[in-house]
From Swiss-Prot:
The keyword Acetylation is annotated on this UniProt entry: no
Signal peptide from the UniProt entry: 1-27
The protein's name: Carboxylesterase 4A
Organism, scientific name: Mus musculus (Mouse)
Active-site residues, Swiss-Prot/TrEMBL: 228 (acyl-ester intermediate), 360 (charge relay system), 475 (charge relay system)
EC number(s) per entry: 3.1.1.-
GO molecular function: carboxylic ester hydrolase activity
Length: 563
């Protein structure tokens, strides 16, 4: 009888497994609670509709073991398989970050209702949005989103992927990676090499290669896309040997690895500051790392706050300011500085779409960096102090500060024109950072043989939480249009929806073919020696040589710096 009972259980178990396999194979994901078999186990998601298009949504899928305990400051490890059916209908915790990450998420939120974030060290999860495929239908291109946030903040759950997945006919993956101290702490040696956040990203891309076909995605057609720090990450992975073969197109929105702040040249200096604030001072980096591993998540967050990351301070020696922890040349993710590799043309020539917004420093970044833009700044002494405090981000020497002020600000100061001064300062910081680095990256990839498409996003987007005075496109303003917020939030005018549809089509076309052009879209020329680019706005049009005179100024300034 015992043997008969065991046989009956075995038969029932086998029957359930076969049912699930058949259910998946026959497109049974049309059900309200779709089931799906991955390499690590069975997932139960949910189904939503965009018009008549059903989208399957799977949230909180683990792509690594939790990076806690001895796995803190260590490369991610593949997740363990699970028994039974794993619920994938609720948003996962976001990676540990300071409270301002919540504000950033509210500002960038693309969903109809804001999802309040929960922070945890156990955060290596991803969200997938996939159109339901008919039996026998071809696999869809995959787009993997890298959230931004200065390597200090960001969450996969800030973004809603249903609109882009449905209208672009793509499978969307939103990943998360460790941030701040937990993601980028490095002693510069084998005790803590660093780049943990980038290794998380690479682990997520490996998960995509192994599992995405089950969601209807094509592992041989993967496009990376990201914004700000996410865009820098995408740009960096394009020259990393660890990421080769894991993607086939790339998109960088407002950020590339050419930005000076992308690489931390002396990570041990920052590591010692962190250790000191944590009470982990020691001459041995091994002991230092072991001590930091013993801290609770709350203690790590407290140390992060005491480091005053991403906060401007014109009264402090710029050499003492640690804007954020960033990637390092570790000999693993990056054998050499990415800019050196790009200069040599050591990059796989995949199609690359990249661009900037025309007012990157309007409100979002100054607010997060606690910079008060006011008329007290309008004198030569104060502006010199402010510009010098930004020297790491602007990549200027102390001797070049008055040269930069003269180029952008002096006439506004002499005319006591506050509006002109403010707008020029916005241009100055945006030009020196995002615009210059993006153009340089476009040229490097073009010269290496990649098809390159450049844009400048110009549409002034309204925000649900702030009224911005400058009539330009702020850092992150393109995201609501890219992810279809005018449709999902349901309160936008027809022009906003048409513009959003245009952006989604460009990005999806690029994911499908490596070329953004398509039917009924304004033509987007390749970025060749003539340096044509697309100005994205309600009246989208072609431009030539983005900010040519200002870029010549910055190029000459950088070339005059001592090596």
């Amino acid at each position: 009888m015992a043997e008969a009972g065991w046989n009956m259980k075995w038969i029932l178990g086998l029957s359930l497994t076969l049912c699930l396999v058949v259910q998946t194979a026959l497109g049974a994901l049309h059900t309200k609670e779709p089931l799906l078999i991955t390499k690590h186990g069975i997932l139960q998601g949910k189904q939503v509709h965009v018009g008549d298009t059903p989208i399957q949504v799977f949230l909180g899928i683990p792509f690594s073991k939790p990076p806690v305990g001895t796995r803190r400051f260590a490369p991610p490890e593949p997740p363990l398989p699970w028994n039974g059916i794993r619920d994938a209908t609720t948003y996962p915790p976001s990676c540990l970050q300071e409270s301002w990450g919540q504000i950033l998420s509210m500002y960038l939120n693309t969903r109809k209702q804001y999802k309040w974030l929960h922070f945890s060290e156990d955060c290596l999860y991803l969200n997938v949005y996939a159109p339901v495929l008919a039996p026998g239908a071809p696999l869809l291109p995959v787009m993997v989103w890298f959230p931004g946030g200065a390597f200090l903040a960001g969450s996969a759950s800030t973004y809603e992927g249903s609109e882009l997945a449905a209208r672009g006919k793509v499978v969307l993956v939103f990943l998360q990676y460790r941030l701040g101290i937990l993601g980028f702490f490095s002693t510069g040696n084998s005790h803590a090499r660093g780049n943990w956040g980038l290794l998380d990203q690479i682990a997520a891309l490996r998960w995509v290669q192994e599992n995405i076909e089950a969601f209807g995605g094509d592992p041989d057609s993967v496009t990376l896309f990201g914004q700000s720090a996410g865009a820098m990450s995408v740009s960096g992975l394009m020259v990393s040997p660890l990421a080769q073969g894991l993607f086939h197109q790339a998109i960088s929105q407002s950020g590339t690895a050419v930005l000076k702040a992308f690489i931390t040249p002396d990570p041990l200096t920052s590591a010692k500051k962190i250790a000191h604030l944590a009470g982990c001072d020691h001459n041995s980096t091994k002991v230092m790392v072991e001590c930091l591993r013993s801290l609770s998540a709350e203690e790590v967050t407290l140390v992060s706050k005491r480091m005053s990351f991403f906060q401007a301070n014109s009264h402090k020696d710029p050499k003492e300011i640690v804007w954020f922890l960033s990637p390092v040349v570790d000999g693993v993710v990056f054998p050499e500085d990415p800019v050196v590799l790009l200069t040599r043309g050591q990059v796989k020539p995949v199609p690359y779409l990249l661009g900037v917004n025309n007012a990157e420093f309007e409100w979002n970044l100054p607010f997060l960096m606690k910079i008060q833009l006011n008329q007290r700044m309008m004198n030569q002494t104060n502006i010199n102090k402010i510009l010098w405090s930004f020297n790491v981000l602007l990549n200027i020497t102390k001797e070049q500060v008055p040269v930069v002020a003269r180029e952008y600000l002096n006439d506004a100061i002499s005319n006591h024109d506050w509006k002109m001064f403010r707008n020029r300062l916005i241009d100055l910081i945006g030009d020196a950072t995002f615009v210059y680095a993006t153009l340089q990256a476009a040229r490097y990839h073009r010269d290496a043989g990649s098809p390159v498409y450049l844009y400048e996003f110009k549409h002034h987007a309204s925000s649900g939480i702030i009224i911005k005075p400058y009539n330009g496109a702020d850092h992150g303003d393109e995201l609501s249009y890219l992810f279809g917020s005018p449709f999902s939030k349901g309160s936008s005018a027809g022009e906003e929806k048409e513009f959003s549809l245009q952006m989604m089509k460009y990005w999806a076309n690029f994911a499908h073919t490596g070329n953004p052009n398509g039917e009924k879209l304004p033509y987007w020329p390749r970025f060749d020696k003539d340096e044509k680019y697309l100005q994205l706005d309600f009246d989208t049009r072609v431009g030539v040589k983005l900010k040519e005179k200002k870029m010549a100024f910055w190029s000459q300034l950088r070339q005059s710096q001592k090596p």
